[in-house]
Design a protein with these regions (language model features):
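Short glycine-/acidic-enriched loop or helix-start segments at secondary-structure transitions
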Residues: 47, 73-75, 92, 137-138, ...
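Long, hydrophobic alpha-helical segments
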Residues: 119-185
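Long, charge-rich alpha-helical interaction segments
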Residues: 205-208
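Conserved C-terminal RecA-like helicase domain
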Residues: 1-62, 77, 86-99, 105, ...
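C-terminal accessory/interaction regions of large nucleic acid-associated machines
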Residues: 13-14, 27, 107, 168-203, ...
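A short beta-strand element within the Helicase C-terminal
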Residues: 64-86, 124-126
Length: 449
């Protein structure tokens, strides 16, 4: 158990997280025991905050993490216990294994003037062949081919554009598609190019915004016809319902059903209504805490109408849909309020990532085709049309942190929207502490200064 000083610190830390999200967040119970967990669906601001706690608070002793630790996260850990031989759905390769074990006993810890210890040059790595390891895993082979550090390995080259890649029947199509994309993105970059070129403005805009979920060359003519009709009608999209319908009409309908990014879900009208709702919250600048409440309310409304309703929850699912071998759905029935809240927290993070990484590119195409009202475009992309707030977001702040600064601390900022630069007053952080702002937002802002 925590002593008095540590308990006070824990109360403050938990209040910060509770206020930012919800009091039912499971991480709070773990934090009380000196444990934090870290995975790709932890909200970014929370993940950065708890990483800092692990570095600075001796009461936080244990970190349970997924392979997100491979993404350059450096923490002052001395021991690592590897319980699984998987990275996502694939087996952990030697290069990923070496990257993973390299996250502990970093040089800045080993050679620290105050706490450094040369014994850390031999990190303690434990591979636990237990219940979490794949049942069909060959443990001896894993030790010899993946975990053995003194064996010589050569990198596996998967990028078809690199010279060392062997081109065969399996990746010939990938090479052609990559070459088509590059040449159409920048004319003349591939010498002797003789494959397809886009012939429409719509096709070019799709290429320039990284759209690769369907064959642009096959469908660009049909897309351009629809775009011409919209332009003849002087269409300027300024609401999320129309936006989602046009994205479906112009792009989504051409995406194969088996697409890996689940964009084909938007062929379903109910899914489009859901993402229209999510985008409305962005336009309305809803906080994370508010979005959690709204998602829970939305699910409860579905449950009241149909007690057997299933909801899409991605990797957290335990129910398969028709024609699928992957569990991506679950039922509200039988779940406690705490379970529903925690499901909402991870799903909001994943839905925001889905919008930013998969959906926004189509918004960009529509904007480049002059089919979006400019202020509405800014609200969809940034959550605001205020130039100063947008400048802060471009400089690395979240919408909530940027909005807080503009609303309460603008005099501590020097913003140049023309050059997209921000200068922070040295007294900003002390003033925010004085005003009792949430330490999660203070930490985020401090890291951007």
């Amino acid at each position: 158990m925590l002593d008095g000083v540590a308990l006070n610190a824990w109360n403050t830390q938990c209040k910060n997280i509770s206020d930012y999200l919800q009091p039912q967040y499971n991480l709070l119970k773990c934090l009380q025991k000196g444990i934090i967990y870290h995975h790709g669906s932890v909200p970014d601001a929370i993940r950065n905050y708890i990483e800092d706690l692990y570095k600075k608070d001796n009461a936080v002793r244990y970190l349970i993490t997924s392979s997100t630790l491979l993404s350059g996260v450096n923490l002052p850990a001395e021991r690592m216990f590897i319980l699984d031989n998987k990275r996502g759905k694939s087996n952990l390769r030697h290069d990923s294994f070496m990257n993973l074990v390299g996250r502990v006993c970093r040089f800045n810890e080993i050679f620290n003037d105050e706490t450094g210890n040369l014994h850390l040059l031999e990190p303690q790595i434990y591979i636990v062949f237990g219940n979490y390891f794949a049942q069909n895993a060959n443990c001896e082979k894993f030790l010899k081919t993946v975990a053995k550090v003194d064996q010589k390995y050569s990198d596996k080259i998967d990028n078809v554009l690199l010279e060392g890649t062997s081109i065969n029947g399996k990746n010939q199509i990938d090479l052609r598609q990559a070459s088509e994309f590059l040449e159409n993105y920048e004319n003349g970059i591939i010498k002797g190019y003789k494959d397809r070129r886009v012939n429409t403005d719509s096709g070019k805009k799709c290429i320039m915004n990284g759209v690769n979920e369907f064959d642009i060359f096959t469908y660009e003519g049909a897309i351009q016809q629809q775009v011409d009709l919209c332009m003849n009608e002087n269409l300027k999209i300024n609401d999320t319902n129309t936006l989602l319908e046009k994205i479906h009409e112009l792009f989504i309908q051409y995406i194969p059903e088996k697409d890996k990014d689940n964009l084909s879900r938007l062929k379903n009208m109910e899914a489009r209504k859901y993402y229209s709702m999510m985008l409305d919250w962005r336009v309305q600048n809803k906080s994370y805490s508010e979005m959690i409440q709204l998602v829970v309310k939305y699910w409860q409304t579905l449950y009241r109408d149909d007690k057997t309703v299933v909801i899409y929850v991605g990797k957290w699912g335990d129910i398969k849909s028709q024609n699928s071998n992957v569990c991506r759905y679950t039922r509200i029935l039988g779940k406690s309020q705490t379970e529903i809240v925690n499901l909402a927290i991870v799903r909001i993070k994943e839905e925001q990532d889905f919008i930013d990484n998969n959906l926004i590119k189509f918004v960009e195409v529509l904007y480049d085709l002059d089919l979006l009202e400019p202020n509405f475009y800014s609200q969809i992309k940034y959550g605001t049309n205020d130039e100063n707030t947008i400048c802060l977001i471009k400089n690395g702040l979240s919408l909530s942190a940027a909005t807080l600064l503009i609303k309460k601390y603008k005099k501590y900022l020097k913003i140049d929207t023309n050059s997209s630069t921000v200068t922070y007053n040295d007294n900003l952080i002390s003033k925010m502490n004085e005003e009792g702002e949430n330490q999660i937002q203070i930490y985020e802002i401090q890291n951007c200064m």
